[in-house]
Amino acid sequence: MDLAALRTQQQQLAASVERADRLDRDPPALIGGADVGFEQEGEITRAAMVLLTWPELELVEYQVARVATSMPYIPGFLSFRETPALLAAWEQLSQKPDLLFVDGHGISHPRRLGVASHFGLMIDVPTIGVAKKRLCGKIGDLGDEPGALAPLMDKNEQLAWVWRSKVRCNPLFISTGHRVGMDSALMWVERCMRGYRLPEPTRWADAVASRRPSFVRWQANHS
């Protein structure tokens, strides 16, 4: 595993990330959500992808792809491990979303190329990173109340918004993936909340991936 070459590739790709809004359809008709996990002790990478209508946020399609894991877990290089399964799930979708939420980081990454940015570049679709844990950078003062907001900074560069979406919950790290500005990323996440910690696109992707009761009920109603 030539990490130096991968690091160089990350830096080159990161330079191509568009940090301003460029949605082909605004407002979007379909918003996607993507979530990646691992099965069989990491040997299989599983990606779940969902499509929701906007503004209703109703689930209209889901796909799950499983591929053999192509590289080990190496912090900072997770996107190389996750994108093959994401691409497989993406290609299975009968329609493509106008905006995609990815469970993971966008530019809030040591080399500014988290999975949301990497995958957004691969498919050239507007993406937003919605991560649950900090990867790098420093958080400003963040209140305990729901809606509390602080920037995630690295020196003078803002990497994400840190946003407490729900009371007594850890905050989310919301960042530009590709073709979505930082403030727009936050705005779209806020618009896609329905009372849970996660926005609906990644909440549904997680529900599909983990076969949570909400998804099992949805399947029963749509069979």
From Swiss-Prot:
Originating organism: Klebsiella pneumoniae subsp. pneumoniae (strain ATCC 700721 / MGH 78578)
Major location category of this protein: cytoplasm
Superkingdom to which the source organism belongs: Bacteria
Protein task: DNA repair enzyme involved in the repair of deaminated bases. Selectively cleaves double-stranded DNA at the second phosphodiester bond 3' to a deoxyinosine leaving behind the intact lesion on the nicked DNA.
GO-annotated biological processes: DNA repair
InterPro entries: Endonuclease-V
Designated name of the protein: Endonuclease V
Binding-site positions, Mg(2+): 35, 103
Subcellular compartments: Cytoplasm
Keywords noted in UniProt: Cytoplasm, DNA damage, DNA repair, Endonuclease, Hydrolase, Magnesium, Metal-binding, Nuclease
Molecular function terms, GO-annotated: deoxyribonuclease V activity; magnesium ion binding; RNA endonuclease activity, producing 5'-phosphomonoesters; single-stranded RNA binding
EC number(s) reported in the record: 3.1.21.7
UniProt cofactor(s): Mg(2+)
Catalytic activity reported: Endonucleolytic cleavage at apurinic or apyrimidinic sites to products with a 5'-phosphate
GO terms for cellular component: cytoplasm
NCBIfam families in alphabetical order: PRK11617.1
Similarity-based family: Belongs to the endonuclease V family.
Site (Interaction with target DNA): 73
Keyword Phosphoprotein: no
